[in-house]
Curated annotation (Swiss-Prot):
Active-site residue list: S113, D198, H210
GO molecular function annotation: carboxylic ester hydrolase activity; cellulose binding
Keyword field: Disulfide bond, Hydrolase, Secreted, Signal, Virulence
UniProt-recorded name of the protein: Cutinase 11
Tree of life domain: Eukaryota
Cleaved signal peptide residues: 1-17
Native source species: Verticillium dahliae
SUPFAM superfamilies, A to Z: alpha/beta-Hydrolases (SSF53474), Cellulose-binding domain (SSF57180)
Amino acid sequence: MQTSALLLAAQALVASAGLIERQSCPSIHVFGARETTVGPGYGSAGTVVNLILNAYPGSTAEAIVYPACGGQSSCGGISYGNSAMQGTNAVASAVNSFNQRCPNTQIVLVGYSQGGQIMDNALCGGGDPGSGITNTAVPLTASAVTAVKAAILMGSPRYRAGFPYNVGTCTAQGFAARPAGFVCPSGSKIQNYCDSPDPYCCTGNNQAVHQGYGGVYGQAALTFVRSKLNSGGSPPTTPPTTPPTTPPTTPPTTPPPSGSCAALYGQCGGQGWNGATCCSQGTCRASNQWYSQCL
């Protein structure tokens, strides 16, 4: 009799713990990924992350933990390609793990520059040869893909003109562009923002444009996210806030072998650059102290 009572009490505790865990899951959870050379946190992705959090009280967010590096000493000298590969794995791990804990929570992905590249890789698959990712499978589980309702990518080097989810004026491509004809199975969930003067997602030379997408397209991004989420959100109770950021840079993938010239749109110079300083096509133009590009 006493044993049965103890058994029932134990079962009740287990059920209660499960109920508490389920109740602690938010209706909406946002993952944000920062750009290259910015310290841990959301970086410029924070603008859109905060817009969503303010629009949906009770929603939660977390930053993807990854190097966000491009060979600079300030971030450990990790190459851009290796950083993007680690970041892609980090997105898959974080999103899959969260979805396993909270299967009914709607997920939104927000990635800026290199952060956009790793979100794109994780959601769309297709591999990323420049980052050493040869497996073309989507690294998110089927359940996690279903839970992801919207993805906002800004200034992503994977941008290529002509994709149905593109937004902006760029008619070219980024330095790590998707191959022509690529089809993302979750394309209807994506908005990919890129304007023509951007030197990283496009072929321009204006760093300020690369850093300005949150201010230019933030409200449009929020409108898109609202259209994709199942539950309506009340208007923001406080004005959206934008965390302070330091101007980052997003250099391209591993330098070409010394002795050869960089290809069109490739890197040809910059502080700490040890690769080619000539261009097989175009002219080497400096965008900033870290990055010169063949244009």
